């Protein structure tokens, strides 16, 4: 659905609702997606895989927005993004925060909202609280104030509907488009519609948290378009997070304040700083962890990871929660065990194990399951030498070696890191094994060792694998 276009092209008509995205053939999905979100218009002579076709150009535009490798073809990474649940508003220019333009903002500070109907998925009190909390996300950083009305027409009309629901943009059934909203304007402008074929929840990790979906949609109601910053609330793809600890990211704060200015009352008290998105082009970047997974490389920092695909030199950035909903943020270490197709994520005294996207039953567990003593409060880095079956843990300036076969720590460990890996004198911050080499990070510097001989080959910087992709 394309609510912004409705404001500009009121004569547009829609003949039928699209098929659910998860059952749609790849090429049909691509065309439908690009029509909905990138203004693609069908050209009878265009094939989805032909270079320089109108479709290829729109694929490139979509790939650039999401930070994918720009191939202009329907590759697996592009399809994976297309199948993720998202907002129904089209994606705009490729930038951090973005506004609709043409001064599409409210010319007053006091706005009204009305909840026209309710979702049967939640109690009315839970819907009321979710909507109020979502509006307060924006009121907290601007002069805008919201008051609820129970009859008549409000500035922001909130409703739940399925398929054709009274505007020109029918919903598409479960998954796919979750909701859409209209930019500030008279009439339908500012209104937010939620797809009743989705499962909306108050706090559960099942379904979609209404507060998070609504907070995003109200950004549109106030004049923001989509951001290409994967950490922003206004990023088009849905991301689960805990509503009780949600803090509006810096990108969204900058965007909304560019329209309305800051909250003249200031913050209500000391609180967390708005989170920012780490930059792969930062020469001082210190990664939290690095691991391989099924031939790809994953780099972790804060709430984020970069994923370097097998056929691409361009890493794709996303929130960890988008990839592994059950995983913690700000992990300490990560390591892949290829023999069991598992990746382990460490934080404090706990370890999580995932197979693909799924949390393995019985996890998280204590790191003592890897033989680490109670004195170890956290792991700084880990790597597995599959040849020898030894899992190496870096803790402060000490190294522990865990024998996968006997499930015990090797005799003679812990020992100083530089006894095994000469020249590493500082604290190890991340490590991984790749094609027979150990890559060990100490701050922004990376050491390349032969895993067999432990001989140092090269000193590199973070950008050797995590390439800067600033356009």
What are these regions (language model features)?
Residues 1-285:
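Zinc-dependent metalloendopeptidases
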Residues 262-471:
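Disulfide-stabilized extracellular ectodomains of secreted/luminal proteins, especially beta-rich
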